[in-house]
């Protein structure tokens, strides 16, 4: 018996180590795919002897005299001013009650049944009540501010720009990631080549991190299992 117990200790230690290693479940990123884009090389212009070459390589290296320099091609950069401030609240309540009472008795009892049902011995009365009262509420608010420079990775058919970008900040033993993607209307871009995040359609903003501090904030899958299984 002692021999089997000695063999059981390594197995138990291996199981504990396995459960500990699988304690952290990685979350699916909100912004997926590449977070940058490279400019598409244009065709080499053919010199026609004129000062102005109409075959400019998709505006690269060409700046109109009376026009602001704004992103319009794949690979151009744009600054997103993060100004997110969202709050929501919800409350609900419900109550219901019901009472009931029933009585049963004999007004007249035959003489030969007086011993059993006489003097209100057969009278019955039942009553019941049921009540319910429930309340619920939820509050949520988030604030996000900052700046992030993104890259145009797609020019849509109507001229809108799909942008995507990422910023990484390494602090001690962890790394913070700020990812952004969305669709920008070129008309909303200011002269400083920036646009508020509130004017970006289909915006995806993600602020996550990795490292032991981030792992300590996540509940293990075994804890989640018992949390969902427990009736308390």
From Swiss-Prot:
Family note: Belongs to the FlgH family.
Annotated localization: Cell outer membrane; Bacterial flagellum basal body
An annotated Gene Ontology molecular function: cytoskeletal motor activity
Protein's recorded name: Flagellar L-ring protein
Lipidation (S-diacylglycerol cysteine): 22
Subunit and interaction comment: The basal body constitutes a major portion of the flagellar organelle and consists of four rings (L,P,S, and M) mounted on a central rod.
Summary of the function given for this chain in its UniProt record: Assembles around the rod to form the L-ring and probably protects the motor/basal body from shearing forces during rotation.
Gene Ontology biological process terms in this record: bacterial-type flagellum-dependent cell motility
Keyword annotations: Bacterial flagellum, Cell outer membrane, Lipoprotein, Membrane, Palmitate, Signal
Membrane-related topology note: Lipid-anchor
Gene Ontology terms: cellular component: bacterial-type flagellum basal body, distal rod, L ring; cell outer membrane
Lipidation (N-palmitoyl cysteine): 22
Keyword Lipoprotein: yes
Main location: membrane
Signal peptide: 1-21
InterPro entries: Flag_Lring
Entry keyword annotation includes Lipoprotein: yes
């Amino acid at each position: 018996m002692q021999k089997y117990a000695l063999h059981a200790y390594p197995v138990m230690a291996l199981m504990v180590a396995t459960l500990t290693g699988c304690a952290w479940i990685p979350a699916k990123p909100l912004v997926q795919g590449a977070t940058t884009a490279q400019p598409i090389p244009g065709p080499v212009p053919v010199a026609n002897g004129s000062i102005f070459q109409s075959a400019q390589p998709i505006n690269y290296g060409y700046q109109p005299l009376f026009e602001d320099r704004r992103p319009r091609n794949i690979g151009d950069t744009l600054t997103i001013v993060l100004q997110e401030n969202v709050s929501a609240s919800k409350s609900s309540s419900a109550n219901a009650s019901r009472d009931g009472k029933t009585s049963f008795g004999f007004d007249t009892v035959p003489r030969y049944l007086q011993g059993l049902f006489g003097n209100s011995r057969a009278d019955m009365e039942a009553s019941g009540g049921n009540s319910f009262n429930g309340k619920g509420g939820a509050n949520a608010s988030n604030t996000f501010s900052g700046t992030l420079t993104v890259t145009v990775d797609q020019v849509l058919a109507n001229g809108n720009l799909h942008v995507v970008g990422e910023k990484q900040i390494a602090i001690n033993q962890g790394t913070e990631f700020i990812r952004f993607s969305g669709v920008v209307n070129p008309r909303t871009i200011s002269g400083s080549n920036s646009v508020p995040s509130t004017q970006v359609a289909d915006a995806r903003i993600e602020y996550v991190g990795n490292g032991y501090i981030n792992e300590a904030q996540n509940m293990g899958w075994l804890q989640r299992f018992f949390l969902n299984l427990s009736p308390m």
